Regions:
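A compositional/biophysical signature of low hydrophobicity enriched in polar/charged and small residues
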Residues: 1-95
Length: 95
């Protein structure tokens, strides 16, 4: 199961929060982003109860985190599949 956790973070705490988030089991990637949220965290776990533990038990306790929204991925599309599906007659994906 893959989920993305969209985080509101105190602006002064973004680097430290990102570093702490990277150390959490189940967190595979952390991005600093523009827009409504400050950080986006990719979480990969096997079960719903693990996701609940990571999001509420660990991510939510990182200093500087002010709020979150979690979205669960239904399906993953690779770059190659997307490139092929939206190709306008340019280069074909290798593979």
């Amino acid at each position: 199961m893959i989920a993305f956790v969209l985080l509101d973070v105190d602006v002064a705490s973004v680097p430290e929060a990102a570093e702490a988030l990277c150390k959490i089991d189940g967190v595979t990637e952390v991005y600093s982003v523009t827009g409504r949220y400050d950080l986006i965290v990719k979480v990969k776990v096997a079960r719903n109860d693990e996701l609940a533990d990571v999001v509420t038990g660990r991510i939510g306790k990182v200093p500087g985190i002010q709020g979150s929204e979690t979205v669960i991925a239904f399906r993953s599309y690779s770059d190659e599949i997307l490139d092929a599906g939206f190709s306008l007659g340019g280069d074909e994906p290798s593979g």
